[in-house]
Structure formats: structure tokens, C-alpha cells
Amino acid sequence: MGQPEKRVEERVRDWGVVVQDMMETQTSFILFGKRGNQSVVLKVIRQPGDEWRCGEVLAAFDGRGTARVFEYTEGAVLLERLNPGTPLASLALEGRDEEATEILADVIGRMSQAPELSPERLKAFASAQDWGKGFQRYLASGDNQIPRSLVEQGQRLYFDLCASQRDVRLLHGDLQHYNVLFDSDRGWLAIDPKGVIGAIEYEIGAGLRNPCEKPEMFASPVTVEKRLKCFESKLKLEPDRALAWGFAQAVLSAIWSVEDGFAVDAGNPSLRLADAIWPILK
């Protein structure tokens, strides 16, 4: 695999990128520059994890609702730079949540028009069932930050939904307000997928629990139902299943936070969403 810094140098050289600026995150090196006349972003992931195959996932959507991919390999992707790159979260945080939800639904709709993958290619990606193993890991860990009864409820619901899925496809897997950016030429587009195989109802879970820094904005039954009506109207999905996925994924998201080393209590945004959904689950 090599050191991340060396891999950055290799990708810059092999993909012909003239670097203009660079930033580092906990997980990645992100370089802004040009390839010929095209403004590009080069993202190099530090080590294998959720985003290791983000280039392959994005490329599979063929630019339908996503940033276009020019090159990719494991742990690195070269894609078009979105300008100005305003995150969808900015609309929601300005009090335009209904508009932001409609945009999120539109992006999901465009992504669902991507070419179908063969069964062999689908098997190459993690499935919703694979991600659900987090429930058992948590129950076996001895951690008690999340109530065991809540984890067990989430686990039962999650795997019931997995067992009854229809029309599974490649999904973004983390389609929330910070992973949808505005481009003046192409509109709102998704970036930074994790890639998971599941039904379309699975895709809205991340959007229900964001923008995560303002849980009071989304963690209420009224807001959840309002957002669900928008998704149902635009995507023709099954609202009861989408709501159930939203609950189960919220619990799983809190589990992932624990696994990532974060303290989790009742104020955790994902748990607050789970609490808001539970009374309206059918």
C-alpha cells in the first residue's frame, strides 16, 4: 500500500495533476488543482476504511447526481472540482430545511438512474447486512453507553428489513447534507460515498439525522414526518420502511461513534433521532 505521502506523489505524477492547494483531514489528503484545462480534486485516503473504494463507487454512478470521476484506484480518486462547492447543510441551517430535503431527494433520484451493476459487481461491495454486524459487535463489547434494549430493538428491526428488501442496488451509503455540494454548472451533486448494497429506502437514513451539529432541528416527530413525506412524494418509496430504516440506522450510527472512540450519551444526535422516531414507528 505504501505511505500516504508517497501515494500522493504517485497519484499527482501518474494522473498529471498540477497542484494549486492542499488540505489534510483525519482520513485523507485533498489536493486542488488542474489537469489540462479541467479543475480537479485529488483525494488520497490515508488507510483502508469506509472511503477506501470511494472512487469506484462514484464511478459506478456515472455522474448521475454525483461528481464526475476521471481516475480512480483503491485509496485514491481524481474528480471534477465543484464550484463553489457550497454544502447542502448551509440551506438547512438557514431555515430552508424543506428545500434542502427536496434537493436531497432529487440527488437520490438521479443516482438511482445510474446503469445497473451485474450481480458479480454488486457482490464486490458491502451489503446492508454486512454493516449490520455492528449491532452484535456492540452487544458483545461490554460497553453500556447505549441502552442494551435500544440496541436490541435496532438490531431486530434492522435485520427484519434486510431480510425483506427488494430491488437492491448500489447506494451512496452516507448521503447527508455535508456530502452534497453545489456546482454552478451541474447543480447539487453527491461526493464521498461509502458504498453499500441495499434498497432505496436505506439511502435516506443519513439525511434524517443531519445536519448533525443541530439535532434540535431534525430530532422531532413533526420534522421526521415532514421529511418523509417529501422523500415519499419524490422517490415513490415505502414510508413505513424508510422510517424503520431511519430508526435502526440511527442506533447503528451511535454504535459506530462508540467504535470510533467518541463518548455517546442521550444527547448524541443519532440517539436523539431514534428517540424521535420510536413513537411514530408502525
Residue ranges and their predicted role:
Residues 183-229, 236-239, 263-273, 278:
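Active-site Asp-x-Gly
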Residues 47, 75-97, 113-117, 132-142, ...:
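A glycine-centered beta->alpha junction motif in the catalytic cores
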Residues 3-9, 113-173, 183, 233:
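An alpha-helical support segment within catalytic cores of ATP-dependent transferases
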Residues 24, 29-34, 69, 155-202:
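Active-site acidic catalytic loop and adjacent metal/ATP-binding pocket
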Residues 25-26, 72-74, 247:
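Short Gly/Ser/Thr- and Asp/Glu-enriched loop/turn motifs at secondary-structure junctions
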